Amino acid sequence: VACVYRTCDKDCTSRKYRSGKCINNACKCYPY
């Protein structure tokens, strides 16, 4: 499954993370 930046970011923010980014085609959440 390809990582989509907008979807990843929205998923992370909905889980109380600050933001999300695609790294090596995987979604990574960032708390800061």
Swiss-Prot record:
Physiological role: Blocks Shaker B potassium-channels (Kv1.1/KCNA1 sub-family).
Top-level taxon: Eukaryota
Domain comment quoted from the record: Has the structural arrangement of an alpha-helix connected to antiparallel beta-sheets by disulfide bonds (CS-alpha/beta).
Tissue expr: Expressed by the venom gland.
Disulfide bonds: 3-22, 8-12, 27-29
Tyrosine amide sites (modified residues): 32
Chain positions of site Aromatic residue of the functional dyad: 30
Family: Belongs to the short scorpion toxin superfamily. Potassium channel inhibitor family. Alpha-KTx 10 subfamily.
One Gene Ontology molecular-function label: potassium channel regulator activity
Signal peptide: none
UniProt GO cellular component terms: extracellular region
Name by which UniProt lists this protein: Potassium channel toxin alpha-KTx 10.2
Keyword terms of this UniProt record: Amidation, Disulfide bond, Ion channel impairing toxin, Neurotoxin, Potassium channel impairing toxin, Secreted, Toxin, Voltage-gated potassium channel impairing toxin
Organism: Centruroides noxius
Gene3D superfamilies: Knottin, scorpion toxin-like
